[in-house]
């Protein structure tokens, strides 16, 4: 039986609808860039690569032609085949957990298991409405680009922008602000592809 995504997301949508409506979806235009060979950037990139497992929490706003919602999220990443994304509301006990274990996606809510599938990306789109490459999400949240693709470094010596195709979709990202931790890590990220916008606000980092 195919479960409708609206059933799971309605309480989550209601709790953060205003956040979704006020998303700043415009790319910054006044950013100045520096070379990829900048020593400070290269040192930062080396430190990012040493972070193998981590967790973070925050807010996620999503806009497409068919969907518009926002939710709190909890991201727990162990390795490329084991990670979990939990969507939740502060106004109700409703949660939606998207967990990948050994490359198989398991979907559950606060009442128990719902579905499992080998095609994680397809299941995520079917149930939640987001067409998001979760296998890339771990690097994107860290601010770590694919070095073989197009990306740009800002004058603050941190990743500012990337643009490259994933699964026949051109994805662009703009890193709007960073937490000034011992290791600077992203705070606000704007992700876009054709017909989709994803605004991420990361509140907490643990690694």
Swiss-Prot record:
Renumbered to this chain, the positions carrying a covalent lipid of the kind N-palmitoyl cysteine are 21
The membrane topology of this protein is: Lipid-anchor
- Localisation per UniProt entry: Cell outer membrane
What keywords were assigned to this record?
A: Cell outer membrane, Chaperone, Lipoprotein, Membrane, Palmitate, Protein transport, Signal, Transport
InterPro entries referenced in this protein's UniProt entry, alphabetically: LolA/LolB/LppX, OM_lipoprot_LolB
The region annotated as signal peptide is 1-20
Recorded hits in SUPFAM superfamilies, A to Z, give: Prokaryotic lipoproteins and lipoprotein localization factors
> What residues show lipidation of type S-diacylglycerol cysteine?
21
Q: What is its main location?
A: membrane
Gene3D superfamilies found in the cross-reference section: Lipoprotein localisation LolA/LolB/LppX
Alphabetical list of Pfam families matching this protein: LolB
For this entry, list what GO says about its biological process: lipoprotein localization to outer membrane; protein transport
What's an example GO cellular component term for this entry?
cell outer membrane
Note the superkingdom of the native organism.
Answer: Bacteria
Listed under subunit, the entry gives: Monomer.
Family of this protein: Belongs to the LolB family.
The record's function comment reads: Plays a critical role in the incorporation of lipoproteins in the outer membrane after they are released by the LolA protein.
Known NCBIfam families for this protein? lolB
What is the protein name stated in its UniProt record? Answer: Outer-membrane lipoprotein LolB
Q: Which organism is it from?
A: Pasteurella multocida (strain Pm70)
Q: What is the lineage of its organism?
A: Bacteria, Pseudomonadati, Pseudomonadota, Gammaproteobacteria, Pasteurellales
| Gene that encodes it | lolB
């Amino acid at each position: 039986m195919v479960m409708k995504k609206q059933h799971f997301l309605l309480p989550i949508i209601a709790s953060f609808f205003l956040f979704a409506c006020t998303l700043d979806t415009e790319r910054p235009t006044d950013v100045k860039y520096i070379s990829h060979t900048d020593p400070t950037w290269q040192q930062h990139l080396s430190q990012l690569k040493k972070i193998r497992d981590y967790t973070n929490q925050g807010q996620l706003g999503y806009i497409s032609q068919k969907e518009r919602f926002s939710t709190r999220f909890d991201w727990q990443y162990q390795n490329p085949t084991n990670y979990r994304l939990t969507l939740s509301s502060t106004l109700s006990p409703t949660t939606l957990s998207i967990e990948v274990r050994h490359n198989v996606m398991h979907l559950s809510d606060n009442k128990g298991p719902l579905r499992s599938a080998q095609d994680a990306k397809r299941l995520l789109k079917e149930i939640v409405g987001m067409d998001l490459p979760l296998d890339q999400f771990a690097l994107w949240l860290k601010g770590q680009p694919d070095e073989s693709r197009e990306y740009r470094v800002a004058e603050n010596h941190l990743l500012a922008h990337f643009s490259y195709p994933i699964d026949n979709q051109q994805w662009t990202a703009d890193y709007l602000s960073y937490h000034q931790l011992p290791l600077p890590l992203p705070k606000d990220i704007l992700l876009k592809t054709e017909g989709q916008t994803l605004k991420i606000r990361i509140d907490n980092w643990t690694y």
